[in-house]
Amino acid sequence: MDDSEEIAPAVQSILDAARERGGGGDRVSVTPKSLPDAFEAAADAGRTPVVAEIKPTSPTADGERADDPVDLAQQMVEGGAAALSVLTEPDHFGGSTATLERVREAVDVPVLRKDFILHENQLDVVEADVILLIVRFLEADGTDDLADLLTAARERGFQVLVETHTAAEVEKALDAGADIIGVNNRDLGELAVDLGTFEAVAPDIPEDVTLIAESGIQTADDVTRMRDAGADALLIGSAIMDHDAATDVEANTRRLTRANTDAVETTTTDT
């Protein structure tokens, strides 16, 4: 992707800000909690594996949550989240590395650093169990190569979630060696959400790859739809956070992590 290729202005602004942010200091070395193991444990316990996302705000959300992120994280885990995603992008999402550090120290589930990493030195900003690399952003001029970044991240101990949107991007992720792939239902060109995106792309992804459906998952029916299409886990932000101080984050998380299990639990109880 060069700078002339269509991309939503809000996303272009995020990309431009990511170019300006510097890297870390000393090279980090991480001993991560396993994301695939966390998903398997959740499924074995009768829960839908969900990565619950802590983001104070976003360009596509109304309002902002001022709750203590650690409190939110603990509520999400109590609600059954298998893992957490913490925004560290400061300019558009209100995130920070300090928040990630506090959350990771407070919970016993894997924590994803949700940011827009373009260069190797940006890996060394903060420790996390998982980092995000976005194929479309890494096609932009002046960014590091996806395969090189994937290798550099693994050398530091990170697990890597490689985000895609199209079949072509999935192919690039697989060619680079990705073993955890996310399919974003949101088109970064128009910001429109279509759950059919995941359904169209998922069949191209080998079974030995951990597959995560991202964006647009709001209801129990959406959860079932994505799981039926092959998602090993779901990354959910707005439907849990809702950017409303009155929203019950724990209840929202539980509603979605139990979306595919209520009928089973009811049957078992009745028996």
Swiss-Prot record:
Ordered alphabetically, the record's keywords are: Amino-acid biosynthesis, Aromatic amino acid biosynthesis, Decarboxylase, Lyase, Tryptophan biosynthesis
Under Pfam families, the record lists: IGPS (PF00218)
Listed GO biological process terms: L-tryptophan biosynthetic process
Recorded hits in InterPro entries, A to Z, give:
Aldolase_TIM, Indglycph_syn_Halo_TrpC, Indole-3-glycerol_P_synth, Indole-3-glycerol_P_synth_dom, RibuloseP-bd_barrel
The pathway that the record names for this protein is: Amino-acid biosynthesis; L-tryptophan biosynthesis; L-tryptophan from chorismate: step 4/5
- Which protein family is it in? Belongs to the TrpC family.
The identity of this protein, by name, is: Indole-3-glycerol phosphate synthase
In which organism is this protein found? Answer: Haloarcula marismortui (strain ATCC 43049 / DSM 3752 / JCM 8966 / VKM B-1809)
